[in-house]
Regions:
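N-terminal secretory signal peptides that target proteins for export/translocation
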Residues: 1-22
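Extracellular beta-strand ligand-recognition surfaces/modules
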Residues: 125-130, 163-215
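Extracellular beta-strand elements of beta-rich domains used
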Residues: 47, 219-223
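Extracellular carbohydrate-recognition regions
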Residues: 40-59
Length: 226
């Protein structure tokens, strides 16, 4: 004797199967949002009280004032330069760029320079910049990833002060708001100096040449694999 499946029972079973499928799909979505399926790697510069202990002052003469603070988005660094030229930096592993060639930078400019010519020695100051490269006393090969209100993004030059240093403008933002940039620093260092590594990173806000006062902020600075 053959038994036929009731249409009602068939519909109920199909509905249960659909509900279970949707539950599983939602679980996968939540899992991917929380944990992600990416193998992306990141190395962050820490501006917390503990992280600040790892940053060393770089430069000579009258010192730029650097202070850290936090808001609802986390820790940030404030830089105030008034005829000063020093930075904060740390040594990093030379192998880092092999896995994490990208540098992510978020900053904002509260008070910028009046009209200066950053292509000359007298105007060669930057409200906000990140320095990378082969840092050493003799024969250094450096790149400054800089903000400029006077030069276009993508502008690249040899520093008027130092043959082994390059200035690369990554931001021309004049909004006064937080903004972020991502740069493949491994490719940039290969292009400018023929090296594919950096042994340090430093934030550097200076105004010693123009003798003007500037205020800038940095946050969320990190190397990443993608």
């Amino acid at each position: 004797m053959k038994f036929k499946t009731s249409p009602i029972i068939y519909l109920i079973s199909k509905k249960k199967l659909f509900i279970e499928f949707m539950r599983f799909s939602i679980f996968l979505l939540i899992f991917s949002l929380i944990f992600g399926f990416s193998n992306a790697k990141e190395f962050h510069i820490d501006f917390s009280d503990e992280g600040m202990k790892l940053l060393k002052k770089r430069g000579f003469g009258k010192k730029t004032l650097y202070t850290n603070d936090q808001d609802d988005k986390g820790w940030y660094l404030k830089a105030e330069a008034d005829g000063t030229a020093t930075g904060l930096g740390m040594e990093i592993d030379k192998e880092l760029l092999k896995e994490m060639p990208f540098l992510n930078i978020t900053f904002k400019i509260e008070k910028d320079f009046d009209n200066i010519d950053q292509k000359t020695k007298d105007g060669h100051d930057w409200a906000a910049r990140i320095m990378v490269g082969h840092g050493k006393k003799i024969g250094a090969k450096l790149v400054s990833l800089a903000h400029s209100s006077f030069l276009e993004e993508g502008f690249l030059q040899e520093s008027p002060w130092t043959k082994g240093s390059r200035d690369y403008v990554i931001s021309n933002d004049k909004s006064g708001e937080w903004h972020n940039r991502k740069i493949n620093v491994k490719e940039l260092l290969e292009k400018t100096h023929g090296i594919s590594f950096t042994n340090f990173i430093a934030v550097f806000s200076d105004s010693n040449n123009s003798k003007q006062k500037i205020i800038a902020y940095y946050r969320d600075i990190y190397f990443s694999s993608e």
